[in-house]
Amino acid sequence: MATDSWALAVDEQEAAAESLSNLHLKEEKIKPDTNGAVVKTNANAEKTDEEEKEDRAAQSLLNKLIRSNLVDNTNQVEVLQRDPNSPLYSVKSFEELRLKPQLLQGVYAMGFNRPSKIQENALPLMLAEPPQNLIAQSQSGTGKTAAFVLAMLSQVEPANKYPQCLCLSPTYELALQTGKVIEQMGKFYPELKLAYAVRGNKLERGQKISEQIVIGTPGTVLDWCSKLKFIDPKKIKVFVLDEADVMIATQGHQDQSIRIQRMLPRNCQMLLFSATFEDSVWKFAQKVVPDPNVIKLKREEETLDTIKQYYVLCSSRDEKFQALCNLYGAITIAQAMIFCHTRKTASWLAAELSKEGHQVALLSGEMMVEQRAAVIERFREGKEKVLVTTNVCARGIDVEQVSVVINFDLPVDKDGNPDNETYLHRIGRTGRFGKRGLAVNMVDSKHSMNILNRIQEHFNKKIERLDTDDLDEIEKIAN
């Protein structure tokens, strides 16, 4: 199947990363290799964070690749039922769902011992008789893909050789990730087949598809349902729209998804998932899913209470680097993440730190998603102690050993104003899991001092000045 070659490519990518050791290089101009070590390249790297604005689909794929297990989600789940008078069920075991034996076997073979928080509440609604529509908010790593795959597999009649379940994903790569979950969970259903409705998958005009489940991107699925008539939309029993927040950020996907939904029968079960519930996503969800049950996560606010924040006054890039060296010389740092505004600065800094003997990994937006995943995995395993990055990984990466976050450049938006949300996500990489963290901000101009002051005002938290030429002062902050 298509997944095999793609998964193999990822394995090869990570195997290549394993075999590369840290490189000691004299050149300033570098680019990231698969293991985040540094190698020569041309100087065409002058891109700001805003220009390489984090691509939502790539970030979502990255989160899937780097998560080997479910995240321990402490958020409260809020269930808003379509019929407030009907009883509200949640389950604590998969046996309570009365699944077909082959499905239960598949669930356990995947390593799921009990339902995750989102699964506890979503599965009884999705597997109810008659099936109910659902809009659910869930981040990567909460088990939502397994939940909707279970719903699809529960409805499929393997003896019927035509599409019965349709799942829309924003990109080919995300479709393949969902496909892998279907193949794993459905492996005790040998007669169950899966088709990918993605660009490049050429079929003869007029051909009918015999696979019971189709996963694809909106444009190709729309063509297959309408123009090419490969799929009879009136026979679809379950329609899943995954990553809705990513979907509406992509030109044309929103309209295509709505057009597909309008072709489906009235009794088709509609399921929509999104990591966020901003107004644009909510409006889209209501167009696509009639009479829904809604599951929301009451998000616990990220807090700065466990993080000590400092700033260092510098007059140049070299002074900022020297301040960084002084920090490393005075205190023990398990692992650190250092954020830069441009790829060029990140590349230069990674090279300089490497020359000083540090084990450095480098992340930037020009890397393929699989390369980024390999770099993050190595950092998580402690093979590199310093991760230098642009905004590309400010979110979603939990590395327990990160004790220090350094803003080599303060985060600003495209207009040069403080990007408070990014600041919060950046320094939130430390002080995780209830531990105390340390954040150090480099300030090298009146403008960056103004940015820092505005960040202080926004969070109502004082950021103390730190003199990195005073070793005693540095040692105090570590206690």
Swiss-Prot record:
GO cellular component, one term: nuclear envelope
Residue positions of motif DEAD box: 242-245
SMART domains in the record: DEXDc (SM00487), HELICc (SM00490)
Enzyme kind, highest EC tier: hydrolase
Enzyme Commission numbers on file: 3.6.4.13
Effect recorded for residue 259 to D: Impairs interaction with NUP214
Keyword tags: Acetylation, ATP-binding, Cytoplasm, Helicase, Hydrolase, Nucleotide-binding, Nucleus, RNA-binding
UniProt effect for mutating residue 262 to A: Impairs interaction with NUP214
Binding site for ATP: 119, 138-145, 429, 432
Annotated SUPFAM superfamilies: P-loop containing nucleoside triphosphate hydrolases
Pfam families on file: DEAD, Helicase_C
Chief location of this protein within or outside the cell: cytoplasm
Domain Helicase C-terminal stretches: 306-474
Localization: Cytoplasm; Nucleus, Nucleoplasm
Residue ranges of the region described as C-terminal lobe: 301-479
CDD domains documented for this protein: SF2_C_DEAD
Catalysed reaction, written as an equation: ATP + H2O = ADP + phosphate + H(+)
Similarity field: Belongs to the DEAD box helicase family. DDX19/DBP5 subfamily.
Reported function: ATP-dependent RNA helicase involved in mRNA export from the nucleus. Rather than unwinding RNA duplexes, DDX19B functions as a remodeler of ribonucleoprotein particles, whereby proteins bound to nuclear mRNA are dissociated and replaced by cytoplasmic mRNA binding proteins.
Quaternary assembly: Associates with the nuclear pore complex via interaction with NUP214. Interacts with NUP214 or RNA in a mutually exclusive manner.
Domain notes: The N-terminal extension helix acts as an autoinhibitory domain, preventing ATP hydrolysis, unless the N-terminus of the protein is displaced by RNA binding, allowing cleft closure to bring key side chains into position for catalysis.
Protein name as catalogued: ATP-dependent RNA helicase DDX19B
Gene: DDX19B
